[in-house]
């Protein structure tokens, strides 16, 4: 994602991808909203240095971006969790939006976008259901999001092949 286009996560779950993308977009450091860290208790912890570093980071935050990040999920429970997680990063409420919607019915936003999706791997649903889901997801993405950039996170190689999408790049990642 180049941070110059709308980002869409059609199976957002708890909203992690959307929220972390929003933080990257606005240059908000990880952990910025935390009030305490374990290193505060270290013997040589320098509170004044910490305040200086934190203020420097604050000065680099840019909330003026005109980009919108959309997360959707079929499960309303996931949307509630996503919204609760977004409450922990209040500066992003103008940028990140969550809604309940089936990924297979999701419309592409106007203009160019990047879709990042982490579909179910088959750990919580049956193998046959995963196969059908990946086939239908591939069809929908090809039709509705044609011409846009797509990133898929999955450890289920067999299911990924069912998407029937042209692969430009592949990366091995450790998730978790």
How would you label these PLM feature ranges?
Residues 1-107, 123-124, 131-133:
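Conserved S-adenosyl-L-methionine
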Residues 101-176:
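C-terminal catalytic and target-recognition region of SAM-dependent MTase-like enzymes
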């Amino acid at each position: 994602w180049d941070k110059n286009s709308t980002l869409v996560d059609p199976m957002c779950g708890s909203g992690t991808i959307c929220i972390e993308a929003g933080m990257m977009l606005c240059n908000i450091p990880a952990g910025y909203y935390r009030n305490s860290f374990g290193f505060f208790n270290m013997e040589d912890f320098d509170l004044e240095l910490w305040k200086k570093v934190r203020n420097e980071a604050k000065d680099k935050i840019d909330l003026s971006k005109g980009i919108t990040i959309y997360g959707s999920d079929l499960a309303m429970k996931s949307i509630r969790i996503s919204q609760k997680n977004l409450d922990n990063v209040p500066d992003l409420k103008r940028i990140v939006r969550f809604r309940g919607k089936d990924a297979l019915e999701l419309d592409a936003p106007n203009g160019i976008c990047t879709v990042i999706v982490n579909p179910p791997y088959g750990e919580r649903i049956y193998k046959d259901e995963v196969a059908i889901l990946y086939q239908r997801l591939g069809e929908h993405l090809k039709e509705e999001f044609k011409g846009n950039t797509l990133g898929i996170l999955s450890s289920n190689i067999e299911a990924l092949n069912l998407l029937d999408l042209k692969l430009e790049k592949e990366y091995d990642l450790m998730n978790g």
